[in-house]
A protein has these predicted regions:
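N-terminal subdomain of nucleotide-sugar transferases
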Residues: 1-45, 226, 234
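Membrane-proximal helix-turn-helix segments that form the acceptor-binding/catalytic region
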Residues: 23, 82-89, 104, 108-112, ...
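Acidic donor-binding loop of glycosyltransferase active sites
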Residues: 156, 266, 280-297, 310-311
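Carbohydrate-associated surface elements
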Residues: 164, 184
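Nucleotide-activated donor-binding/catalytic signature segment of Leloir-type glycosyltransferases, i.e.
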Residues: 252-277
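Conserved acidic donor-binding segment of nucleotide-sugar-dependent glycosyltransferases
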Residues: 326-337, 345-350
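A charged, aromatic-enriched C-terminal amphipathic alpha-helix characteristic of glycosyltransferases
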Residues: 350-381
């Protein structure tokens, strides 16, 4: 099939939704389909068979787009709509495949041209307004809710990335359109040598000192201050904390908090690192932690954590428990004392290692690329009645 994909993202950048989009395209390519991707002017070009990247013009000199809703995206999405409309006018497509807010006009274009539409629902956009503190306006939320319902009603199939979104579609009466596809696929990198791990580890922890690792952005919902408060409770010279990621301004803010808590000597920050380096940092960790205190979507990092064979500590909230349980991780209440105790348990209790082994076995069994590709094929079948090549 010839597919027009609409992605209101900087593609490619190593963050949640662009990573997800990359693997959607890869699976479509491996199934024999061609994808024209209309996306923002920012990002690294990626080479995939059958992929053509069509970028909007850089009319506003915008160099950065933050995660979540922003006013910056409004003019960019208008240009995305114009580019998508132009593509529809000059070329025949069998299907429109939209991500996030591009679903608003992707469904409209599909209706006008009489072709199926697939909506890739990475999140509930009305909920994102609250999660990122973008707006508390009831009017704006009502508008977003109506737009979301319009997209769901007029899409032939909807991909949801977690059980929470699947439940939302069921609640709204669109259960038959939903197909759960967790973002469990990640890039494969060359094997890391023990010598490389040892050298990198020496930068952050003396011999015999264990490392508690966090990887991700420093957005408020991630719970970084909460993690630092827990670190302050673990007064053990055998434990260091390593936080990988974060914008420079956010990192500086957390460094000041670490100084205030008098834990700067055992809490280290790397700032943002290349996505290709993340597996190296994961290999350094003795325990991997996700201290989220809000949100409902499953963090992408959880899948990498489970595959690592390292003990995972996470808050006992729906954002995590859609995937995690106490057989494969250490779940803690979203309280400082509970997180500190959970980390200590994961570091020094043999049972935590048993859970980590069980997690890896489950991930190796369940989180496979053939299964991922099969789900994409099923979504095409649902939308088009065959997912045929052309």
């Amino acid at each position: 099939m010839k597919i027009l994909m609409l992605a209101p993202e900087p593609f490619f950048q190593p963050r949640g939704t662009p990573i997800s989009i990359y693997f959607r395209i890869k699976a479509l390519s491996d199934l024999g389909h061609n994808v024209d991707l209309v996306t923002y002017h920012l990002g690294e070009d990626k080479r995939i068979n059958g992929l053509k990247i069509l970028r909007i013009p850089d009319l506003f000199s915008i160099k950065r787009i933050k995660i979540g809703p922003s006013f910056t995206k409004i003019p960019l999405d208008f240009l995305l709509l114009c580019k998508a409309t132009w593509q529809m006018m000059k070329k025949h497509y069998d299907l429109i495949f939209s991500h996030e807010e591009a679903g608003w006009f992707g469904t409209a274009l599909a209706k006008i041209w009489g072709i199926p539409h697939i909506y890739d629902m990475h999140s509930s956009l009305p909920q994102q307004l609250e999660n990122f503190g973008f707006s508390r306006s009831k009017l704006i939320k009502r508008i977003f809710l109506r737009l979301e319902r319009f997209v769901l009603k007029n899409s032939k199939a909807v991909i949801v990335i977690c059980l929470d979104l699947e439940a939302k579609l069921k609640e709204l009466g669109f259960e038959a359109k939903a197909r759960l596809l967790e973002n469990f696929i990640d890039f494969e990198y060359p094997e890391i040598s023990e010598d490389e791990i040892r050298r990198k580890r020496e930068e952050y922890a003396p011999r015999g000192v264990k490392i508690v690792l966090y990887v991700g952005n420093f957005q408020p919902y991630q719970g970084i201050p909460f993690l630092l408060e827990a670190a302050e409770k673990i007064r053990d010279g055998r434990v260091n904390f390593l936080l990988v990621g974060g914008e420079s301004a956010d990192v500086e803010k957390m460094k000041r908090m670490a100084m205030y808590l008098n834990i700067s000597d055992r809490v280290h920050f790397t700032g943002q690192v290349a996505h290709s380096k993340v597996p190296l940092f994961i290999s350094l960790g003795d325990v991997l932690v996700s201290p989220r205190r809000s949100g409902t979507n499953t963090p992408l990092k959880i899948y990498s954590f489970l595959k690592s064979g390292k003990p995972v500590v996470a808050t006992n909230l729906w954002t995590h428990t859609q995937v995690l349980n106490n057989k494969i991780s250490v779940l803690v209440e979203p309280e400082v004392e509970s997180l500190a105790k959970g980390i200590y348990f994961a570091l020094f209790n043999e049972e935590a290692k048993e859970r980590a082994r069980a997690a890896r076995e489950m991930a190796d069994r369940e989180f496979t690329y053939p299964r991922y590709k099969k789900i994409i094929s099923d979504v095409l079948e649902k939308a088009c009645g065959g997912g045929r090549k052309s």
